[in-house]
Amino acid sequence: MIATGGLLRISARKQDPLRPPSQIPKRKRKAKKRRKNDVVVVKGKLKLCSISGLIALCGILVLLVGIAMAVVGYWPKATGTNREGGKQLPPAGSSHRVPTTANSSSSGSKNRSRSHPRAPGGVNSSSAGAPRSTPPARAASPSSSSTSVGFFFRIFSGYLHSDKLKVFGPLIMGIGIFLFICANAVLHENRDKKTKIINLRDLYSTVIDVHSLRAKDLAAAAAAAAAAAASSSSSAPAAAPPGAIPLNGFLSYVQSRGLELKPGGCGGSGDAFGAAAMLAKGSWPPHPAAPSGGRPRGAASPPDLASSPRCPREPPSLAEAVYSVYRERSGVAGSRRAAAATAAAAASSCSSPAPCSPPESWGRQSTASSFVDSSLSAFALLPLQGGRDRGGDAEGASCSWQRPPGERGSQEIPRGELDLSMTNLRGAEGSMRGARREPEEPEGAVAARAARGQGGRLPRTGRYAALRRRSTSGLPDYRAPPSPEPPPSPGSADPDSSPLAKAASPSPPLRLEGSPPTRRDSGSSQSDDPSSSNKGYTPLREAGTSTESVLDAVAGQTRDSAVAAPVLGAEQSSPEGASQEPPTAEQPQPVQRQFTNKEKLIMISRSHAIGVEEELESTGI
């Protein structure tokens, strides 16, 4: 039954066309090969120069000796007569004497047969006798010449066909074979001990672990290099204010998020963490120098990176923008407490050196921080940074960025537009109510100052772009009070300050260095301002008046040009590049004209820069 069942299975496999029998072993072989590929075998070498190798050699020699003994014992024999002659005669001469007798008998028979037909038989007998004596002479000559060969032959001929050799020859052969086999086994065992089997999976895991460790080491080295670059590029920090941000957590967050920080440090390191190093400057050393007012500044802010020749002008990174806003929020509390103390000093402060000057020219509040709403509009998408208030001393705008020179409005824009915190605007209303108010500044002064800002064409200032953003936003200025300004002192005018600061022209208590930007309700500002009933539009007295509208007014009225000329001359006479210290007051001008809403919209639509320049040249400003 078993045999028939096997035959039936074999026949079924042969008749099955779907699964040929050759595919199954192929799959098994492939699987085995894959398994073998997962393992690498490193074999050792046989050490023949060892005890086991010597024993194997001895076994081979013993095997050869046994083979020789067996050959001598089992040497074949010719006939039975040779056996009898071999037993009676000595072993040395038996082999030579037997053929000689045979030769003599044969020769004798031949001679006898020849002597009968022929008469002279003596000659034949004598000739036949000569050969009888010749064979012994020939046999003696080779034995004397080859003594060595005869010696070995005599030894083996004595044991030839010996029964002892027939027994001990194969026995010695077996001993030699046994020794060789044992020594060979020991040699291979020693080789197998040194053979290593390496699993490729373990090898791969080891390599991956090594690479991961190297990656961690490289990351640690990069972090150490970044810390070293930050420490080398940053100056010796002073005591940090109470509201300072913890920089370690911020820097680690920036690095973990993978923000692409551009080199912001002026130390020339060029490292990718240069901006992080600049952010690490939480506090700056106090500067001993004092302005012309006589009050030494408590703390200094970082230099103007955009105006410095060592640093390229570029847009700020996300980290710098966030950090600037946070510092502005943290410094507002200290600036409120120092508002009353710095009022007199701000009123008596004079102009300082250029934007690249030492830290005493960094202590003004950003003039663009008053119109936060306009900076957040669609026309002010560029992130800016403003002054930073620390320990009761406000720090000026430190970095300004510039567009390519081919674009329109390629001047710098103050950083204070983004730094102003919306939450701090509500808290500043209390300090704003206590400030003294001044009468409204006429529109002529605003027009003159705006025309002067466009005519002077001072570098590194975003006058035109800022005015465009301010005018198109359509939001009123909540910082300027409806009170007139006192006449400015001769040394208080700053030629390099932004025309926004000159146009806004708040009262001295509102332009204090340590005072935060304040906000008033639109209803109150419009109720106090007789010319502010324009349905939400910014009146011409404020800094948001568009440049085109001002220039149109100047072109249409000759009195505007006459008023703006001395102001422009005063600005050009002062050295260019002075510090951005805000002017305390402006000369009030007579009210010229009030524009309707329709006229304002028409004037705002005229925004081309080339037309502005042509109007400036035509009016002679």
Curated annotation (Swiss-Prot):
GO cellular component, one term: membrane
Ranges for region Disordered: 12-37, 80-147, 284-315, 347-368, 384-598
Ranges of Low complexity composition bias in the record: 125-147, 290-303, 491-505, 523-533
Bilayer topology: Multi-pass membrane protein
Compartments where located: Membrane
Biased composition range(s): Pro residues: 479-490
Residue ranges of the TM segments: 53-73, 167-187
InterPro entries in UniProt: DUF2371_TMEM200 (IPR018787)
Ranges annotated as biased composition (Basic residues): 25-36
Biased composition (Polar residues): 586-595
Basic and acidic residues composition bias: residue spans: 405-418
Broad class of the protein's primary localization: membrane
Pfam families: DUF2371
Keyword terms, alphabetized: Membrane, Transmembrane, Transmembrane helix
PANTHER family per the UniProt record, alphabetical: AGAP005329-PA, TRANSMEMBRANE PROTEIN 200C
Family: Belongs to the TMEM200 family.
Name of the protein this chain belongs to: Transmembrane protein 200C
Species name: Homo sapiens
Classification lineage: Eukaryota, Metazoa, Chordata, Craniata, Vertebrata
